[in-house]
């Protein structure tokens, strides 16, 4: 459920592994309207942030035409208005083009897409669509983001509210 970056990537890997894959997404086309998140780390930055993740270049495929710009630093502006710069290899994506490219990769690997179809609920191995259609699957992946029906069924709102606190401090730290 969900054909965004996570759903399309899971679909590609599952299809490449020989599984029969159907991605259901309420949007048509996938990626519209824009949801969020256009700044992402480059693959080189991901390798330094997550050194134990194998095959980063295969996992995160971003075609050149989906990259709006690149940067080598990030700036955080503190409440007092003073900025702090730090090294960070990043890319600003054209998210619609990026999502379309990931859908194309998954489809070229054999995944099928059912777009413009809303999931009403999921019961065990059954996915119930809002038009009354019932789909069966041995494995159902919830990649629909915050509004995903599997997320709603298994995780409460309170469990997702993770307080994040941090302190910005200038200087060299190791």
Model feature map: region roles:
Residues 1-6, 22:
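Beta1/beta-strand and adjacent pyrophosphate-binding region of the FAD-binding site
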Residues 3, 13, 17, 29, ...:
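Predominantly flavin-linked oxidoreductase catalytic cores and closely associated redox partners
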Residues 8-12:
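Short, hydrophobic alpha-helix immediately C-terminal to the catalytic nucleophile
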Residues 13, 26-74:
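N-terminal FAD cofactor-binding segment of flavoenzymes
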Residues 19-25:
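Short beta-strand "acidic-cap" motif of Rossmann-like dinucleotide-binding folds
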Residues 72-78, 125-128:
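Short polybasic amphipathic segments
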Residues 84-105:
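Short beta-strand to alpha-helix junction loop
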């Amino acid at each position: 459920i969900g054909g965004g970056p996570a759903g399309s990537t899971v679909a590609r890997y599952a299809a490449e592994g020989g599984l029969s894959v159907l991605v259901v997404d309420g949007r048509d086309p996938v990626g519209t309207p824009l949801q969020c998140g256009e700044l992402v780390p480059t693959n080189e930055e991901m390798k330094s942030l997550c050194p134990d993740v194998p095959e980063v270049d295969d996992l995160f495929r971003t075609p050149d035409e989906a990259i709006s710009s690149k940067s080598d630093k990030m700036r955080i502006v503190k409440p007092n208005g003073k900025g702090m710069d730090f090294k960070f290899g990043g890319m600003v994506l054209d998210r619609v083009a990026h999502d379309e490219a990931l859908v194309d990769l998954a489809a070229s690997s054999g995944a099928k897409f059912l777009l413009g179809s809303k999931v009403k609920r999921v019961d065990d191995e059954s996915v119930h669509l809002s038009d009354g259609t019932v789909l069966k699957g041995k494995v159902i992946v919830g990649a629909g983001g915050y509004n995903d029906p599997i997320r709603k069924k298994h995780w409460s709102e309170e469990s997702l509210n993770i307080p994040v606190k941090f302190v910005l401090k200038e200087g060299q730290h190791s």
